[in-house]
């Protein structure tokens, strides 16, 4: 096989792989994280909705989900010495309980019946790493 043909095939293969990684082009903003990942996977599955809030975790609305996960109302600045939320430590996905739950590390994986794809977990992780902003 001529060298130029091999080079073209290799470039085509690499381009195809790059196109398959749709995670990088999906936003890591709170609106997307809640509406596209948490709400359909956690709240509408009747586990963490307003009517069936397991462990007092209501993820059904953007406001309630943010308050539960981060520990403050969206838009309110953190107060000095304020404890962080039960699930998210902004800027620190490696020590955020939400990441342990989504990956099933040291605990039962969430959601238990249909774990999130790695790409969606990566988006949540990126959101936390970026400081878990709500806007």
Give the positions of each predicted feature.
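Bacterial N-terminal signal peptides that target proteins for export
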Residues: 1-10
